[in-house]
Amino acid sequence: MKFLGEGEWKRKKHGPEYRRQWRKLHIGIDAKTLQIRAIQLTTNNVSDSQVLGDLLNQIPQDERIDSVYTDGAYDTKQCRQVIADRQAHAVIPPRKNAKPWKDTKSSSLERNELLRTVKRLGRTLWKKWSGYHRRSLVETKMHCIKLLGDKLSARSFGSQVNEIHARVAVLNRFTELGRPLTQVTP
């Protein structure tokens, strides 16, 4: 999300400004209902993997999480442990230069087995087999959020968080109203 950004024309004519600031939006969705269930707005110097625990903690502990689909930026021991702590299945592709982990935790052993499988079968086949394509639902939802505006009007960080939460509430309501309700009658 752009914050205190500048227009394309100004950037082309005068060059980029060096004090540009960005906010990163991290979301978690329910793949069945397509509702945004977890949201975190951070500054541009916070990595994706640092907020995974906060995102999962926004979902009540008594609600079951089946699987967590993420990109390779989340291929860390900490992220896999956070997912395992919620008794969920981690669907995270190993990084391109991934090496086996030496510890004997179950999440590390599972990741090492995944690494062997990807090397043996190939990344494309693993993505089809694992259902990794479901991660694109989040990318689609991010696109929908940006359709409501890719810039933040608020100046203070707290107000920006409120602005994002308002957009997400509107988008969740749109999603609820726009989803078809299918019933099969015998």
Q: What residue spans do the PLM features occupy?
A:
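Exposed alpha-helical structural elements
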Residues: 51, 113-114, 137, 165
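Basic, amphipathic alpha-helical segments enriched in Lys/Arg and hydrophobic/aromatic residues
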Residues: 123-186
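Short alpha-helix boundary/capping motifs
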Residues: 80, 111, 172-173
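Polybasic low-complexity intrinsically disordered regions
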Residues: 1-89, 93-95, 100-102, 106-107, ...
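Hydrophobic alpha-helical segments with strong N-terminal bias
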Residues: 8-10, 32, 55, 118, ...
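Acidic, Ser/Thr-rich peripheral helices and adjacent loops at domain boundaries
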Residues: 104-119
